[in-house]
Amino acid sequence: MSSDQVLERFMKNGLMNAELKEFFEKALVNEGFSTMELRMQETPIKIILKVAKPHEAIGEKKFRLRQFQHLAAQRLEVPDESVEIVVEKVHEKGLCALIQANFIREKILGGVQYRRAVNMALKTARHAKAQGCQIIVSGKLKGQRAKSVKFQDGVLIHSGDAVKDYINTGYATVETKQGVIGIQVRIMLPYDPEGVLGPNYPLPDRITILEPSEIQ
């Protein structure tokens, strides 16, 4: 396979991954969609979805799951039986930025004042043991002039290799009578030695002091 063919295949797989992620993000917004992982190298092709409400995402008698399987197979240009969709439950939705962004969106659509909705999301992230949470709400929040308001609780890192593993980012938009409001949520995950709730490696500046008995 030539380098041009490899590049074309890589770009095609990336495009399919982005399109499928966008589809599931919209289709499962009420079920608390978190992430999607596409494993093209496996047989059958495996799509792993993480949601807050897996039972609702699967549907009664797996009806919705079969629908998703058919639509995904069409996009991947393979038979239905060549695609397997696995739905997993999010371990802690308070640590998922996308779920929190959509939570704020739903609250605003329900008539809740945006500051109150943001504070509720910050509290949820704090209770989930997040190291920090930053929420930016932009648009015509009050009056005719658009503005951005930033809320932050705890600490967040902004540079270094650890950002890609420790910072979880999610976006949502709300259409109101005044215009479109944008919501950006950034959550700094906790250090988790088991790698379930957060990265299994500590930050470079983390210092561990050993007891004298542990020093050889």
From Swiss-Prot:
Entry's CDD domains?
A: KH-II_40S_S3
Q: What is this protein called?
A: Small ribosomal subunit protein uS3
Q: Which GO terms describe its molecular function?
A: RNA binding; structural constituent of ribosome
Task: Give every KH type-2 domain span.
Answer: 20-91
The UniProt entry's GO biological process terms, in alphabetical order, are: translation
Q: Which gene encodes it?
A: RPS3
Q: Which family does it belong to?
A: Belongs to the universal ribosomal protein uS3 family.
Q: Which domain of life is it from?
A: Eukaryota
Q: Does the keyword Membrane apply?
A: no
Source organism = Encephalitozoon cuniculi (strain GB-M1)
The answer, when asked if Cytoplasm is one of the entry's keywords, is: no
Q: Name one GO cellular component term.
A: nucleus
Q: Which UniProt keywords apply?
A: Ribonucleoprotein, Ribosomal protein, RNA-binding
